[in-house]
Amino acid sequence: MDQLHVFFFPFLANGHILPTIDMAKLFSSRGVKATLITTHNNSAIFLKAINRSKILGFDISVLTIKFPSAEFGLPEGYETADQARSIDMMDEFFRACILLQEPLEELLKEHRPQALVADLFFYWANDAAAKFGIPRLLFHGSSSFAMIAAESVRRNKPYKNLSSDSDPFVVPDIPDKIILTKSQVPTPDETEENNTHITEMWKNISESENDCYGVIVNSFYELEPDYVDYCKNVLGRRAWHIGPLSLCNNEGEDVAERGKKSDIDAHECLNWLDSKNPDSVVYVCFGSMANFNAAQLHELAMGLEESGQEFIWVVRTCVDEEDESKWFPDGFEKRVQENNKGLIIKGWAPQVLILEHEAVGAFVSHCGWNSTLEGICGGVAMVTWPLFAEQFYNEKLMTDILRTGVSVGSLQWSRVTTSAVVVKRESISKAVRRLMAEEEGVDIRNRAKALKEKAKKAVEGGGSSYSDLSALLVELSSYPHN
């Protein structure tokens, strides 16, 4: 039998790029010829991440295409959604991505893969794959729960008769009773008013989801069995749950090479953690796209200090104040250093290495799905602080269904990545202490540790994710190609 050749084309944002690279590495480790597609400016991250797989002899490579920045008035070199600082820039970025269909088709014509795995935002990938008679698999970068709950809310609009944005509603037609408020979900009033492009894009995404060959999900059966079953049996959707994809990086070197270069030496970070007791450190990080204003960062610093817990805090550039000395509380950094109470990392951190360390007992997170899964794989309970995208659904999975998280009380969904609503220091301190210093927190942390073992077993030989991938590869290998 000829070697199966699969193209992988992630949406151009770190939260989509990293799991897709992991997926390509996983496929290649199972004998597949894996080819990743990206733009010129993003290629360095891809090449670094696959280097060890190539050394081990796996058939994995990267092809690049040009991103049409200039055609849409975007700055030269602007090739990831993470760089967006306004709604207008994000909209232009999405429009520019539509023009990637033609160069993708040129690569499909030249290299003739047997299947295409493309991100859900590339809804036009169905048409591209159909031109060459190959199946298009849609990569959904969230959980089945979030996918199903969000679809139910979009379809049923259970918020439409509410008198206030803060009034609660129950998400209809799903296995669990999940309560949200209108302000916590994207609604047409907020995301699509005067923006027909966004309306049209989500309509196209929904249609492509229904028409594609099937959906690949970065999750595992034991994490959300009711929703995996619901997806297949009630929605009738062909889906393969092959995660957690980050566990394909089972060597320290793989983990360290994943994503951007850390702004702290990994050994320095791990040495600091080695000096701490098990379950004593709170890790605080809000991913690659979240940007808080100065007032919120000030409250976060005060909340961490008032909690009395040791912490590692990954600080990205503040959106309205480049100099962190302007928003750090007076003497904060000095007190943290002198008391050896915390480690502040400015920029990018080796997140997976940190979460896997036994000293880490809690993860304050925006609930992006990659970060959520990395916390699950590390056996770390979460303080949930969702901001945008599907993150409020991910929060509900952690706090209400799995019961491995405590909410900080975030109430406002936003389309842009800055949060105008300030979560007060008292709420932050209370949530952290509830998880780290109260009896209830012990049970929550124990449930999180049990999930870690289930995640590991899922990707091992005979595990649910391993078996789902095996079934998919058999199916793709027997697909009748032109």
UniProtKB/Swiss-Prot annotation:
Q: What induces or represses this gene?
A: Significantly inhibited by Al(3+) and Co(2+), moderately by Zn(2+) and not by Mg(2+), Ca(2+), Mn(2+), EDAT or EGTA. Competitively inhibited by UDP.
**Statement: the UniProt record of this protein carries the keyword Transmembrane:** no
Reaction catalysed by this chain? delphinidin 3,5-bis-O-beta-D-glucoside + UDP-alpha-D-glucose = delphinidin 3,3',5-tri-O-beta-D-glucoside + UDP + H(+)
The record describes its post-translational modification as: The N-terminus is blocked.
Statement: the UniProt record of this protein carries the keyword Glycosyltransferase = yes
Query: Cross-referenced InterPro entries, in alphabetical order?
Result: UDP_glucos_trans
Q: Name one Pfam family in it.
A: UDPGT
**Active site feature:** H16 (proton acceptor), D119 (charge relay)
Q: Where does an anthocyanidin bind?
A: H16, A389
Sorted alphabetically, which keywords does the UniProt record give? Glycosyltransferase, Transferase
What one GO molecular function would you report for this record?
anthocyanin 3'-O-beta-glucosyltransferase activity
In which tissues is this gene expressed? Answer: Abundant in petals and barely detected in leaves.
Record-linked SUPFAM superfamilies? UDP-Glycosyltransferase/glycogen phosphorylase (SSF53756)
Residues binding UDP-alpha-D-glucose: A349, Q351, H366, W369, N370, S371, E374, E390, Q391
Q: What class of enzyme is it?
A: transferase
What does the record give as EC number?
2.4.1.238
The record's function comment reads: Specifically glucosylates the 3'-hydroxy group of delphinidin 3,5-di-O-glucoside to produce gentiodelphin. Shows a strict specificity for UDP-glucose as donor.
Instruction: Please report which protein family the annotation says this sequence is part of.
Output: Belongs to the UDP-glycosyltransferase family.
- Descriptive protein name: Anthocyanin 3'-O-beta-glucosyltransferase
The organism encoding this protein is Gentiana triflora (Clustered gentian)
UniProt lineage: Eukaryota, Viridiplantae, Streptophyta, Embryophyta, Tracheophyta
